């Protein structure tokens, strides 16, 4: 088994444990949605998840996808990303990281910048806000779109 597959399986097991701890029933559809999110590096929309899973789950609906994503979000194993357009994207990586977004094709890529980890503490100190989280986005044109 490759390291990536082992990592996906480990993340899936941890997510299932979180769902069980919250009293959520584990269904094959939930597992498939989670597995897709964990293995996806594209921050998919609910429609993209639906299109990827519907061949294996012909009775699954977009509403089922949305309902499960809401459950995952409420438990804290998925983040919903909204960007002014009408479709939310979903990110399994809930650790502090940032996004660079292609202005032409909408591709979203994660990147780390550890120096920003202190920004919440600094903002809280300077403003007396109770900071809950932060989000940073950088926009540009990806290599694939530049080459077109």
Swiss-Prot record:
GO annotation (BP), single: negative regulation of DNA-templated transcription
InterPro entries: FUR, Fur_C, WH-like_DNA-bd_sf, WH_DNA-bd_sf
Domain of life: Bacteria
Example of a GO MF term: DNA-binding transcription factor activity
Residue positions binding Zn(2+): 102, 105, 142, 145
Entry's Gene Ontology cellular component terms: cytoplasm
Pfam families: FUR (PF01475)
CDD domains per the UniProt record, alphabetical: Fur_like
Stored PANTHER family: PEROXIDE-RESPONSIVE REPRESSOR PERR, ZINC UPTAKE REGULATION PROTEIN
Main function: Manganese-dependent repressor that controls a regulon of oxidative stress resistance and iron-storage proteins. Regulates expression of genes encoding antioxidant proteins, such as katA, ahpCF, bcp and trxB. Also regulates expression of the iron-storage protein ftn, the ferritin-like protein mrgA, the ferric uptake regulator fur, the manganese transporter operon mntABC, and its own expression. May act as a hydrogen peroxide and organic hydroperoxide sensor. Required for full virulence in a murine skin abscess model of infection.
Family in the record: Belongs to the Fur family.
Protein name: Peroxide-responsive repressor PerR
Organism (species): Staphylococcus aureus (strain NCTC 8325 / PS 47)
């Amino acid at each position: 088994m490759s390291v990536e597959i082992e990592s996906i399986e480990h993340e899936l097991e941890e997510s299932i444990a979180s769902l069980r701890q919250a009293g959520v029933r584990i269904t094959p559809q939930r597992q498939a949605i989670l597995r897709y999110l964990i293995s996806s590096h594209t921050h998919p929309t609910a429609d993209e998840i639906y299109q990827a899973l519907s061949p294996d789950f012909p009775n699954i609906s977009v509403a089922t996808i949305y309902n499960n994503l809401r459950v995952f979000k409420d438990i804290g194993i998925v983040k919903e990303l909204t960007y002014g357009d009408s479709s939310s994207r979903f990110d399994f990586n809930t650790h502090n990281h940032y996004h660079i977004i292609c202005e032409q094709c909408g591709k979203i890529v994660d990147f780390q910048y550890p120096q920003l980890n202190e920004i919440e503490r600094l903002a809280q100190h300077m403003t007396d806000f109770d900071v809950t989280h932060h989000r940073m986005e950088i926009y540009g044109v990806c290599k694939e779109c530049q080459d077109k």
